Amino acid sequence: MPQNEYIEQHIKQHGRRLDHEERKRKKEAREGHRVAKDAQTLKGWRAKQFAKKRYSEKVSMRKKIKAHQESKVKGPSTPKQDEGEALPTYLLDRQTNNTAKALSSSIKQKRLEKADKFSVPLPKVRGISEEEMFKVIKTGKSKTKSWKRMITKHTFVGEGFTRRPVKMERIIRPAALRQKKANVTHPELGVTVFLPILGVKKNPQSPMYTQLGVLTKGTIIEVNVSELGLVTAGGKVVWGKYAQITNEPDRDGCVNAVLLV
């Protein structure tokens, strides 16, 4: 046996630890945490190398998944009549039912229907800078610390919302700028109803603003439409529906929205 294979030799002679499999399983389970920590903490050249390695891993994984999905797709449903005769390229797809093509066309059709279903009244809105969105709050004994921010726009918080302790609250959402209801207009019925807001679905400015519940022009919100008496095709009452804010709530002092139907 070569000299550099002493570990394999020792395993063959004495075997492994009794808890080897358990230790190996736990190490593999911790691998995700280690990768996440490296992604957050690495700096400089090591971070670049790590990002490059992760990018190549993700690309290879995507290729494997795509190849696996393509292998599942069936080929022509009926075999060719004469196997021995070679057909030219322009005759290969004639009189054959390819499931992959049907699947691709159905996916495209569904995407078009989805885009048409959720077309919004305001497709584009003005961008808002962080200086306009947040106000710096000075804290500390001598007012030298400036890690706190106060949102200057109207926000929505849920029913069970509780503020964090003052010394740990980084972003302040003032109680005076919180909204619970919106003036929602139904485009087909032509009526405007004062409906309670259920949540913020999407803020076009940033995902962080969506998480904070900031209400700006163009934001998609979910409202309670049970008062309108809308019913589905199956006869069930519609509870929540999406609406888009069409005004500037911080200027008008109220939220006006159009229901997406």
From Swiss-Prot:
Main location: nucleus
Subcellular location(s) per record: Nucleus, Nucleolus
Keyword ATP-binding belongs to the record: no
Pfam families reported for this sequence: Ribosomal_S8e
Motif (Nuclear localization signal 1): 15-22
Gene Ontology cellular component terms for the protein in this record: nucleolus; preribosome, large subunit precursor
InterPro entries for this protein: NSA2_fam, Ribosomal_Se8/biogenesis_NSA2
Keyword Nucleus annotated: yes
CDD domains with a match to the protein in the record: NSA2 (cd11381)
Alphabetical keyword list: Nucleus, Ribonucleoprotein, Ribosome biogenesis, rRNA processing
Motif range (Nuclear localization signal 2): 51-58
GO BP terms: maturation of 5.8S rRNA from tricistronic rRNA transcript (SSU-rRNA, 5.8S rRNA, LSU-rRNA); maturation of LSU-rRNA from tricistronic rRNA transcript (SSU-rRNA, 5.8S rRNA, LSU-rRNA)
Basic and acidic residues: compositionally biased ranges: 7-37
Renumbered residue ranges of the record's region Disordered: 1-38, 56-84
Job of this protein: Involved in the biogenesis of the 60S ribosomal subunit. May play a part in the quality control of pre-60S particles.
Assembly and binders: Component of the pre-66S ribosomal particle. Interacts with NOP7 and RRP1. Interacts with RSA4 (via WD repeats).
Assigned protein family: Belongs to the eukaryotic ribosomal protein eS8 family. Ribosome biogenesis protein NSA2 subfamily.
Protein name: Ribosome biogenesis protein NSA2
Organism per entry: Lodderomyces elongisporus (strain ATCC 11503 / CBS 2605 / JCM 1781 / NBRC 1676 / NRRL YB-4239) (Yeast)
Gene: NSA2
